[in-house]
Each structure stands twice: as C-alpha cells, then as structure tokens.
Amino acid sequence: MDKNIKEIIKNMDLKFRNIDGKKLLLAISTDKQKNVLMTAFMSEESLEKSIETGYMHYYSTSRDKIWKKGEESKNVQKIIDVYRDCDGDALLFTVEQTGWACHEGYMSCFHNKIDLNTGDSTVIGTKLD
C-alpha cells in the first residue's frame, strides 16, 4: 500500500470502533443532491482501497470481507467528496452512483417508510432493475 495513502488516513483522525471483533467505522453515501443512498461499514483497508481507486469499497460483516460496491452488479460509486463527522467514527461520502445503490433494485437502500404509530412499512420509490 502506498505510504501516502496511510498518511492521508492518519491525518483524517478517525476512530475505528470495535464491531464484531473488527475495527470499523460507519460509511454513508449520498448522491450530489445529498439523497442518502446507503450505509455500510468500512475497515481501514477498505478505506485505503477507496482512496487508492476512487471508488467505494466497504467491509461486509456478514461475509467477513472487503467488497467493491458494484463488483457484481456494476452499480459502482465513484467518490466525489468525503466528510468526517465530529467524533471521527463515521464518514459521509458524496458519490456519483452508476445504476441503483440498493441490492433490491432501488436507488436508495432507504425505500421502506415506517409508520411510527403502527410500525408498518410502505415501500416508496420505484424499483429500477
């Protein structure tokens, strides 16, 4: 790994949290209009790959591995900007989304609106696949 990328990450002053025995932080991706597309975890290695390639890489706790967003679907996320939260344990990425972000075929993973009076959910948005 390029030493420069490790320096960049060090300068970001991040606080990776112990989640399922792994050092992870929360990554949120939005489009240019600031619509939330998805959230996932990142490890330091997936963050390195994201910086190195310019495309989002996440850490899957269920598969216990790093994955490039769109490696199977081709619905990749090209990084435009990144913001660190005040605690340093979450990153907000502005991305250029190719295709849809959700593996269920919706633009956003947040397509289930919950009624707080009943707990019932309603699918909003259009399935794109």
Swiss-Prot record:
Query: Which residues are listed for Zn(2+) binding in this entry?
Result: 86, 102, 109
**InterPro entries in alphabetical order:** PRib_AMP_CycHydrolase_dom, PRib_AMP_CycHydrolase_sf
Tagged with keyword ATP-binding = no
Q: Which Pfam family, giving just one, matches this sequence?
A: PRA-CH
Which family does the record claim for this protein? Answer: Belongs to the PRA-CH family.
Q: Where in the cell is it found?
A: Cytoplasm
EC numbers, comma separated = 3.5.4.19
What's the protein name?
Phosphoribosyl-AMP cyclohydrolase
- Which SUPFAM superfamilies has this protein been placed in? HisI-like
Q: In which pathway does it act?
A: Amino-acid biosynthesis; L-histidine biosynthesis; L-histidine from 5-phospho-alpha-D-ribose 1-diphosphate: step 3/9
- Which GO terms of the cellular component aspect does the record hold? cytoplasm
Question: Briefly, what is this protein's role?
Answer: Catalyzes the hydrolysis of the adenine ring of phosphoribosyl-AMP.
NCBIfam families the record matches: PRK00051.1
**Annotated positions binding Mg(2+):** 85, 87, 89
Cofactor binding, per record: Binds 1 Mg(2+) ion per subunit. Binds 1 zinc ion per subunit.
What UniProt keywords are attached to this protein's entry? Amino-acid biosynthesis, Cytoplasm, Histidine biosynthesis, Hydrolase, Magnesium, Metal-binding, Zinc
| Record text on subunit structure and interactions | Homodimer.
Q: Does the keyword Protein biosynthesis apply?
A: no
Q: What class of enzyme is it?
A: hydrolase
Catalysed reaction, written as an equation: 1-(5-phospho-beta-D-ribosyl)-5'-AMP + H2O = 1-(5-phospho-beta-D-ribosyl)-5-[(5-phospho-beta-D-ribosylamino)methylideneamino]imidazole-4-carboxamide
**Which cofactors must be present for this protein to function?**
Mg(2+); Zn(2+)
